[in-house]
Amino acid sequence: MAVIGALPKEVAEAVSASRLLVVGAGGIGCELLKNLVLTGFTNLDVIDLDTIDVSNLNRQFLFQKKHVGRSKAQVAKESVLQFCPDASITAYHDSIMNPDYNVEFFKQFTMAMNALDNNAARNHVNRMCLAAGIPLIESGTAGYLGQVSVIKKGVTECYECQPKPTQKTFPGCTIRNTPSEPIHCIVWAKYLFNQLFGEEDADQEVAPDIADPEAAWDPTKAAERANASNVDGDIKRVSTKQWAKSTGYDPIKLFNKLFRDDIKYLLTMDRLWRKRKPPIPLEWASLHNKENCSEIQNESSLLGLKDQKVLNVASYAQLFSKSVETLREQLREKGDGAELVWDKDDVPAMDFVTAAANLRMHIFSMNMKSKFDVKSMAGNIIPAIATTNAVISGLIVLEGLKILSGNTEQCRTVFLNKQPNPRKKLLVPCSLDPPNPSCYVCAIKPEVTVKLNVHKVTVQMLQDKILKEKFAMVAPDVQIEDGKGTILISSEAGETDANNHRKISEFGIRNSSQLQADDFLQDYTLMMNILHSDEMEKDVDFEVVGDVPEKGPQKPPEESVKNITNGSDDGAQPSTSKAQDQDDVLIVDSDEESPSSSNADVGMESASLKRKLPDEEAVSSTKRKRIEPPVEEDDDIIALD
């Protein structure tokens, strides 16, 4: 190997003797595997849950058209062995969050290198490397931007030392009643897809929100309208899916309900339109009269790239009808009770969302978007740049060589910019920060305070929204610190399922209660202090108090770096990654890697999930004996739906 021959003898020996774990075999992963074997690393393990898609072939050079549909990790191994047959590579087509890959598994490796595309997996690998005591090199790209950083237990910040920007969400009443931006209509259209063809979610309702406080002159009327009963003369409410089924998914009836009747109903909430331009209902018949029919555009007749053309309203109405018919047939083929899953690469599903979103944009007087733009926003996409991946993968190897040579103090967080900074540098290195003493992951005794309403939060919400989603646990076990060792949540299948729909107050949890949450897979324990509040904001289930930890003085970066947000164009640009970070939605390639960790000087965030990860199986470990929860007083508990 030419490269290893140029290294100092001690470093070359360390390279030959090391065993590396590469997590991810996508854009960065392909480049990284090539760089590693050409540098002299021959003992590698690579893991990736994904399979090869046609859209990967323009930049993930280890894959060819004949490989589409196969495991990325396995094909990457085969391709690398063709030009480096002496390498020993083990490939895993699996999720790194599988309990099989426990702390002992991670301890086999000299170091781990992340080439991931989602925050949940990054959090998990961060914790596993901390537990195993091995260095981790984190990386990410987003378009022309990139970042590499080193994480070492007790020496540097971990991936979670600095809080990541929270997911961008929109109030339900904005989505349902008063959209003001194209993204609001696109989110509504995705919700509509699930309400009609997929898994129904009460939080994704698309019908006008009659409980919108802004729509009522008297604030008390909002609650009254929301709770109106059939006796009061209200029409009996049925779900959107039930209604659609009753019509046989008739495209014209669906169109008139969604874009005419619901809009007319919104207009009756006249207070909403005092300072807004009112929506204009659409009528199927008027769009398809003789005059408008002549204006319907045939996509095949459009010049240029058809997905980048904006059609007229009549054409989007026609596209809506055709996509509904296609999706209806897909449901019928799957049988009774079947559900469809929205995928940006599924043509009928993408056509449906494009048509529905644009029709709603037109109704609310917004400029309509091309299918390409809708797909970018709905699928959280930033075009991936192969050169960026190549540069970042090279930097990963350089940082790895510093670690193997024993010069961890020389490691840097390096940002790749879109344009040179004032010092004409594209690559900007910054000193690594020490561990954050307030970090709820790598602190000696991780502890956090969570503000919530104990009479509204259920055990299921505690497990899914707080422990798994917010604190990135995989298989949490929760014990109430009540002197009895009451087990509230167990990762053993079925052991505490009966608790799921009960409010946590029913277990004696109140203000100042303490919960100990353990994830035995991650070798991670978090002490949670409960701060009860009866006055949580609307649509806010909980709040982490002091989520932004105080940091001590920082070392000045070796090069100044401007703080960047999506869409800025002020020179240096190291950052973007979460599709939720700004009002016009920061778009990230859901198929690609994105900048991974935040920094005081540079806003680098993590990418969106590529897919819903499978539920992990229960973790085998020694568990405390479950003690039945107290069934005592339900003192003044108010059960709220």
UniProtKB/Swiss-Prot annotation:
GO cellular component, one term: SUMO activating enzyme complex
Enzyme class: transferase
Source organism (scientific name): Xenopus laevis
Catalytic residue list: C173
Biased composition (Basic and acidic residues): 548-561
GO molecular function per UniProt: ATP binding; metal ion binding; SUMO activating enzyme activity; transferase activity
Quaternary assembly: Heterodimer of sae1 and uba2/sae2. The heterodimer corresponds to the two domains that are encoded on a single polypeptide chain in ubiquitin-activating enzyme E1. Interacts with ube2i.
Function: The heterodimer acts as an E1 ligase for sumo1, sumo2, and sumo3. It mediates ATP-dependent activation of sumo proteins followed by formation of a thioester bond between a sumo protein and a conserved active site cysteine residue on uba2/sae2.
Keyword set, alphabetical order: ATP-binding, Metal-binding, Nucleotide-binding, Nucleus, Transferase, Ubl conjugation pathway, Zinc
Region of interest called Disordered, as start-end residue ranges on this chain: 546-641
Name of the protein in question: SUMO-activating enzyme subunit 2-B
Lineage of source species: Eukaryota, Metazoa, Chordata, Craniata, Vertebrata
UniProt: Zn(2+) binding residues: C158, C161, C439, C442
